[in-house]
Amino acid sequence: MRSYERSKAAYAEAVKLMPGGVNSPVRAFKAVKMDPIFMARGKGSKIYDIDGNEYIDYVLSWGPLILGHANDQVVEALKRVAETGTSFGAPTLIENELAKLVMERMPSIEIIRMVSSGTEATMSALRLARGYTGRNKIVKFEGCYHGHGDSLLIKAGSGVATLGLPDSPGVPETVAQHTITVPYNDLQSVRYAFEKFGEDIAAVIVEPVAGNMGVVPPEPGFLQGLRDVTNEYGALLIFDEVMTGFRVDYYSGQGYYGVTPDLTCLGKVIGGGLPVGAYGGRADIMEKIAPSGPIYQAGTLSGNPMAMTAGYETLRQLTPETYEAFKKKANRLAEGLSEAAKAYHIPHTINQAGSMIGMFFTNERVTNYETAKTSNLDLFARYYQEMANEGIFLPPSQFEGMFLSTAHTDEDIEKTIEAARRAFAKMSDCL
């Protein structure tokens, strides 16, 4: 067994300083029945806690670190920028360069606005959609998490699902009444919502791959069906690609599935590990944003040169071949985990989209939030604990996915599979 004494002491202090001892709820490790593990440093595919334990990391800061920790080119670029000034409150050339790089790989984005978080991106995109259409209501999907904006905390995923919270207190009924929530992968329910409220629906917002109820890919035809119904009723289609953007494919989720949204929200990978978000889309819509239009949105640190540099240096290193390599490694990891689970009769379902993998402790096919919730959470907690002791760092929630980086080696994958075999062997006694 590994020692976590320094982490335990750090957490005991943290709970006196911050709500629940953390600055984002899922980091509290409540779902895995452990105290949080405090990290000290990372390099490549490895991460090291303050007790000196080493892990192969599949959290990667919840997805942004697609090149692994402390990538040499990103770090060197950040050093250069830090020496010339970390923020100016004025435009810089690197904003143009990152914008062009994003738009080259995401043709649906004709104009882009940089912000400082994924939440800021989705909140701003919804305000824009309402302002552009003159309508009030939005459609979202059960278990999909789009940040902590009031309109979006209705039947949300991520930490909301992890902690088993109902709709968040503090969201006024007058706000909640404009959010229509339907099951993910259920086009019939979407059509029913439009038949009933279509004249007042401004937008449908969706993750191309639902990443905050585990990893749940879209069923064939689902995303195209959303495109069709929004076109029919004059509503906007917003892809929340904060997680899937430049993660599932070189051309992101919209390129991978061949469906073009009106607006796209980005984050995570485009910041290379620094706080970044962005939203963009059709020029006729984006031109409504101030100062070119009347819909207001602003930010002190939007376009921050440090964050823009980290994003630019990250995207610059990603090629179509990168994603082919990801696919092979992710396939091997998913197959290996499944084989290990079968060997010890562990109920499981594995979903995969590019370099995102979700493992559920249920034999039921997971296609939406209801089926995701059939996973045995006690088994997941035991699995997490055993894998942590084996030196494998996983997201401490059943409702979050694993991520791969370019730094993960074939050896890392095989070590992870062998660790899972040992973990499942120990877990088989509680079935």
From Swiss-Prot:
Top EC class of this enzyme: isomerase
Residue numbers bearing the N6-(pyridoxal phosphate)lysine modification: K268
EC number: 5.4.3.8
Reaction catalyzed: (S)-4-amino-5-oxopentanoate = 5-aminolevulinate
InterPro entries: 4pyrrol_synth_GluAld_NH2Trfase, Aminotrans_3, Aminotrans_3_PPA_site, PyrdxlP-dep_Trfase, PyrdxlP-dep_Trfase_major, PyrdxlP-dep_Trfase_small
A cellular-component GO term for this protein: cytoplasm
Keywords in alphabetical order: Cytoplasm, Isomerase, Porphyrin biosynthesis, Pyridoxal phosphate
Pathway terms, separated by semicolons: Porphyrin-containing compound metabolism; protoporphyrin-IX biosynthesis; 5-aminolevulinate from L-glutamyl-tRNA(Glu): step 2/2
Keyword Cytoplasm carried by entry: yes
Location(s), subcellular: Cytoplasm
CDD domains: OAT_like
Keyword NADP: no
Recorded GO MF terms: glutamate-1-semialdehyde 2,1-aminomutase activity; pyridoxal phosphate binding; transaminase activity
GO biological process, one term: protoporphyrinogen IX biosynthetic process
Cofactor: pyridoxal 5'-phosphate
Summary of subunit composition and partner proteins: Homodimer.
PANTHER family, per the entry: GLUTAMATE-1-SEMIALDEHYDE 2,1-AMINOMUTASE (PTHR43713), GLUTAMATE-1-SEMIALDEHYDE 2,1-AMINOMUTASE 1, CHLOROPLASTIC-RELATED (PTHR43713:SF3)
Sequence similarity: Belongs to the class-III pyridoxal-phosphate-dependent aminotransferase family. HemL subfamily.
Protein name: Glutamate-1-semialdehyde 2,1-aminomutase 2
Organism: Anoxybacillus flavithermus (strain DSM 21510 / WK1)
